[in-house]
């Protein structure tokens, strides 16, 4: 639509004393209702917009009948004149183009399209008028007519950047910054296909090798590079050495952790095996100890039984021997007493010879229990010695008789055995 022609029509409308409808301006309102593009400023077509709005409301009231029934109790009833004045007052107070201009132009150009009653039409107009945000005309800056607007929603066309027309929240609101788009898609090769993962891995490995080789270069190589690229070669070399030291530390720590894990696992397995072996060996030892204890107890019992039997046998053997010794000692005492009384005149030499004969005969007869016999013999010797000292001299005849009696006494225990 020609903007110059539109401006001339608006000037003619203002110059006329009697306000009438202009087909050129009606065509402009239809264009705004279809596209949402306001090619001129609000101050230029504000007068005709208010005139058209008032005329449409009056025509709608004359053409539409009054409601026959009572008004809806849930809705506040407002008279037509009061609602009309309220709407016109709001539109007159606008300083810019309301962002609902497209919908308002639709209501002005075709009021009966969606409404049949006057009160509903007025409420629809009031809802679209009671707004705050404003928009600028599309041709005001950059003369860009590529932005399309449908029902308050902006549809950018071929222009890559936003303009003043796209700021639907008014002139004072901040606008988004123009930032370059970052493509998140995979890089495309020359044939149009995305790169494969193998090629990516190969590139990564090459980059790592390059970085490693660069870091491992000596200070002399770094200093040989042009001074424009590397202003501080010493610092770069120190940083490279620090990176290498860190890598070596990480590698050593990883190896130490792996070896520690392996050693711990081996220790655990060996400990488990050792426990099983110790348990089995302890069981075997317990069995062996039990067997040895049983054998030892059996042997001890057998030895105890044998000792008891031996002691019993020896006690049996010792009892008659002791009895015989006691009898012999008693007989000897009685014989010695008798001989001492009868033969007081026996000589000491004869007595000693008789005692020797007695001892020799007793030793040949009793060889087993030597200790007891010897003790008894010593007692008899002492008694005989005491008796011999008391008696004095003994005759040779009495000594011969004593020899015969002694032989008889020694024969008696042999007969008992």
Curated annotation (Swiss-Prot):
Q: Which UniProt keywords apply?
A: Cytoplasm, Cytoskeleton, mRNA processing, mRNA splicing, Nucleus, Phosphoprotein
Basic and acidic residues composition bias: which ranges? Answer: 197-213, 231-258, 283-297, 318-327, 353-363
**Where do Polar residues bias regions lie?**
140-149, 158-170, 186-196, 259-269, 385-399
UniProt GO BP: mRNA processing; regulation of double-strand break repair via homologous recombination; RNA splicing
Query: Positions of the region Disordered?
Result: 140-417
Q: Where is the composition biased (Acidic residues)?
A: 298-311, 338-350, 400-417
Q: Does the keyword Cytoplasm apply?
A: yes
Bias (Low complexity): 214-226
Q: Which GO terms describe its cellular component?
A: centrosome; cytoplasm; nucleus; protein phosphatase 4 complex
The record's PANTHER family line, in alphabetical order, gives: PPP4R2-RELATED PROTEIN, SERINE_THREONINE-PROTEIN PHOSPHATASE 4 REGULATORY SUBUNIT 2
Relate the assembly described in the record.
Serine/threonine-protein phosphatase 4 (PP4) occurs in different assemblies of the catalytic and one or more regulatory subunits. Component of the PP4 complexes PPP4C-PPP4R2, PPP4C-PPP4R2-PPP4R3A and PPP4C-PPP4R2-PPP4R3B. The PPP4C-PPP4R2 complex appears to be a tetramer composed of 2 molecules of PPP4C and 2 molecules of PPP4R2. Interacts with DDX20/GEMIN3 and GEMIN4. Interacts with RPA2; this DNA damage-dependent interaction recruits PPP4C leading to RPA2 dephosphorylation.
What protein name is recorded for this chain? Serine/threonine-protein phosphatase 4 regulatory subunit 2
Can you name the source organism? Pongo abelii
Q: What is the lineage of its organism?
A: Eukaryota, Metazoa, Chordata, Craniata, Vertebrata
**What gene codes for this chain?**
PPP4R2
């Amino acid at each position: 639509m020609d903007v110059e022609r539109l401006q001339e029509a608006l000037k003619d409308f203002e110059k006329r004393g009697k306000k009438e409808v202009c087909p050129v301006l009606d065509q402009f309102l239809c264009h705004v209702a279809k596209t949402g593009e306001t090619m001129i400023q609000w101050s230029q077509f504000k007068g005709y917009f208010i005139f058209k709005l008032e005329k449409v409301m009056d025509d709608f009231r004359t053409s539409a009948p009054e409601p026959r029934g009572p008004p809806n109790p849930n809705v506040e009833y407002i008279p037509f004149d009061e609602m009309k004045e309220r709407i016109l007052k709001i539109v007159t107070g606008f300083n810019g183009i309301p962002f609902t201009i497209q919908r308002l132009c639709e209501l002005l150009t075709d009021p009966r399209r969606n409404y049949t009653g006057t009160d509903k039409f007025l409420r629809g107009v009031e809802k679209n008028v009671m707004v705050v945000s404003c928009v600028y005309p599309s041709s005001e800056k950059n003369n860009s007519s590529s932005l399309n607007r449908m029902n308050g929603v902006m549809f950018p066309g071929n222009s890559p950047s936003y303009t003043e027309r796209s700021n639907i929240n008014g002139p004072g609101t901040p606008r988004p910054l123009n930032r370059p788009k970052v493509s998140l898609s995979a890089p495309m090769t020359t044939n149009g296909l995305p790169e494969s993962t193998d090629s990516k891995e190969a590139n990564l490995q090459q980059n790592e090798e390059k970085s490693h080789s660069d870091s491992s270069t000596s200070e002399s190589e770094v200093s040989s590079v042009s001074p424009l690229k590397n202003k501080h070669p010493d610092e770069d070399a120190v940083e490279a050495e620090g990176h290498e030291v860190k890598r070596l530390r990480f590698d050593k720590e990883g190896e130490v952790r792996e070896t520690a894990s392996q050693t711990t696992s081996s220790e655990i397995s060996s400990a488990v095996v050792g426990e099983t072996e110790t348990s089995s060996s302890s069981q075997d030892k317990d069995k062996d100890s039990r067997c040895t204890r049983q054998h030892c107890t059996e042997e001890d019992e057998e030895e105890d039984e044998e000792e008891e039997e031996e002691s019993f046998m020896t006690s049996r053997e010792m009892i008659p021997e002791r009895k015989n010794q006691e009898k012999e000692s008693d007989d000897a005492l009685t014989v010695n007493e008798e001989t001492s009384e009868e033969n007081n005149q026996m000589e000491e030499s004869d007595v000693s010879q008789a005692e020797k004969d007695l001892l020799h005969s007793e030793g040949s007869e009793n060889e087993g229990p030597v200790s007891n016999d010897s003790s008894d013999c010593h007692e008899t010797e002492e008694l005989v010695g005491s008796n011999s000292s008391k008696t004095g001299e003994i005759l040779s005849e009495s000594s011969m008789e004593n020899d015969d009696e002694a032989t008889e006494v020694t024969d008696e225990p042999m007969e008992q055995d």
